[in-house]
């Protein structure tokens, strides 16, 4: 039996993907059956971190070492990730959500529809307020765009109003939100998005 929802979490290195996965797990683990697959190029660092901080029980977390280009492992040849997801689904047949965190990649990264049902794409304010208008599949076509680290805007000279305008223009009707995952600001918007996807999922 497959999980009700396979949710990809992608974005550049350091944008806050692992922080988002941890926050989702901590907030929803008491009401949903969750599991996580992380991707790193040469290590299992993110999986080890999530285990160390107790985001979920260790047996619900899988680390995938992609080698080479992390984009390939979630798009062109996602077999290693699909195997990890299917293994979790066999071990936990009542899973509601499997979160698949990509390795850090560029704005062109996107998940194969064979691997995930929906994708959250995470960027951060520290990369500059021009990022939303640069476009790319993550910016324009992800199911939810998360603009993280809003607390750093003043420190890096980023204008949140510019980012708001550009994100709205680039995404049209697709949702997006600001977050500061360190403090939890904006997390409710992400959780609400995730929960809204579940009731209509096929069993």
Curated annotation (Swiss-Prot):
Record-level GO cellular component terms: cytoplasm
Pfam families given in the database record: cobW
Protein name as catalogued: Urease accessory protein UreG
Keyword presence, Nucleotide-binding: yes
Binding site residues for GTP: 11-18
UniProt signal peptide: none
Highest taxon above the source species: Bacteria
Gene symbol of the encoding locus: ureG
